[in-house]
Amino acid sequence: RGTMVSRVLYRPFDTEDFDAIALILQQLWHNNSDNDEYNRLEAACDLAYCLSSSTFSQVAVIEGQARGIALARAGQSSGATVNEHWMDTERALLSQMRELEPDACAEYLSFVRATIRTNNRLLESSPLPHDNEVTLLAVDRDVHGLGVGSVLLDAAVSHLSSRGATRAHLYTDSNCSWKFYELHGFKRTATHRA
């Protein structure tokens, strides 16, 4: 690809980025239903959930378009850090999902519950503190390989350490790039086979 890479601008998440970021999540992880509108809602719901529990955001913008995001949560995972606006958004999206595709929605919710259970188990079996989490890292497939994910992850980790975290954790599925995380000083402390 001999194209010139445009400048990448990094800044905190803005509500106007929501649709573009949700679309990235949809392309990466939320494409199981034949109903595209449902997939869109599911991705948006996932994003709203991540935003509701995060204390830090960084978005990569290329040519005016949000192409990547990192979210993190520093400090105790108490209700103090929960963002009501995004919780309400998540709830509204869930009810739309339920109306549109009740079965797919039920499946998504049981997947989310299972994931939370698994993540909590993994956390208990690892020596990590329960707070200080990189809650989301997603980069548009079209810009993979440009180092955008590295900058975003480093920004999230820097935020956590500026809040006094000596360790941070993130959850990932098995088809992620382990090498990428290892290069950033992460190592697998626990795994779960679904």
Listing of model-derived features with the role each one plays in the protein:
Residues 77, 169-171, 187-194:
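Conserved catalytic-core motifs of GNAT/GCN5-like acyltransferases
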